[in-house]
A protein has these predicted regions:
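ADP-ribose/NAD+-binding catalytic cleft of ART/PARP-like enzymes
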Residues: 2, 94-195
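Long, compositionally biased intrinsically disordered regions
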Residues: 276-330
């Protein structure tokens, strides 16, 4: 039986196990909660709310561990989660939860999307990016394509050449739909605490506004491997990358907000195989874009390469199916 003592605004509570809590400035509402509490956690939350948060976090981790151990795709080892068919790099818990949800609902499309996304993200040498990107993309409602790339947006300026654009900040980049835009990773600021710094900037549809740093809006595909900084505390959903692929011009609504690029366009059918094949097969001398497999523990080059080629192959197969369906309609 708990013992409760109140002296003015000071309340002292002794729980059944002998643990004693005391706190000043207790309100009448809080005191009534203490007196009428059905469980000790309700009392502890008033005196030490951080303890309840820790307990809830522990419970959440235990529940996640239980789900992972029942999974046919993920593994729980040494308090970390792994997707062994992809790599031996630990999977962020937010992504793991999404994979488990898709597995529970037998959603093969999402499972393939998540596998492809994680395959590409494993190529990112920055641990912060690997840990935070999935959370960031979901937080700011980016669309993740089946191939694992994600759709992002930016504004650009026109040039004197039709169909060729440039960045508003420096007017030095050649930007054209269907051509990779790249910046050496070493020239980018990888500090995720810096929201606006060196690198190629891409944004969520909820952040970008008409005429903000450019008069023309573009939808772009970005490889998770190329992201260099994910501002964890960003309030507007902008990140930095070292490469992106412009895929189309976009429109804005009457409020100057992005009209999101439609998902059912088949855009990945033509562009993604090119990016992946050229990225893998390119050499230092002749490739504008390369997919580097980082030399980090947990990455097996052959396994990652096989998964990359499978992504490209599946996209090509789907392209052929779409073409056949279109021809049959005609």
């Amino acid at each position: 039986m708990q013992k409760i003592i109140r002296i003015d605004d000071l309340v002292i509570v002794t729980l059944d196990d002998g643990t004693t809590y005391q706190k000043s400035n207790i309100t009448d509402e809080e005191f009534n909660t203490i007196v009428n509490a059905e469980c000790e956690d309700d009392i502890i939350e008033i005196f030490c709310p951080q303890i309840v948060e820790v307990r809830q976090e522990i419970k959440s981790i235990e529940e996640l561990e239980d789900r992972v151990r029942k999974s046919n795709l993920l593994e729980w080892r040494n308090d970390a989660i792994y997707f062994p068919i992809v790599s031996e790099l630990s999977v962020p818990k937010e992504l793991a939860t999404s994979i488990l949800d898709a597995e529970d609902s037998n959603d093969s499309l999402k499972l393939e999307t998540y596998k492809n996304f994680w395959t590409l993200l494993c190529l990112n040498p920055d641990e912060d990016c690997r840990n935070n990107l999935w959370w960031f993309l979901n937080r700011y409602e980016f669309v993740i394509a089946k191939c694992g790339f994600f759709v992002a947006y930016r504004n650009v300026d026109k040039t004197h050449t039709e169909g060729v654009y440039t960045d508003h900040h420096s007017h030095t980049f050649r930007i054209k739909i269907g051509e990779m835009v790249t910046l050496d990773r070493s020239a980018c600021d990888t500090n995720s605490h810096h929201e606006c710094s060196n690198g190629l900037h891409l944004a969520s549809p909820n952040w970008l506004n008409k005429n903000y740093y450019g008069t023309i809006g573009l939808a772009c595909l970005c490889n998770p491997a190329d992201v260099v900084a994910v501002p964890r505390n960003s309030e507007y959903g902008k990140l930095r990358t070292c490469a992106y692929l412009p895929i189309d011009k976009i429109e804005y609504n009457t409020n100057g907000k992005v009209i999101p690029y439609p998902k059912e366009t088949g855009f990945e059918c033509d562009l993604v195989p090119m990016v992946i094949y050229e990225g893998i097969m390119g050499t230092e001398n002749n490739a504008a874009y390369k997919l580097e497999i980082p030399d980090v523990p947990g990455i097996t080059k052959d396994r990652i390469t096989d998964n990359l080629l499978e992504i490209a192959k599946n996209v090509i197969v789907e392209r052929n199916i779409l073409q056949d369906e279109q021809e049959n309609k005609e």
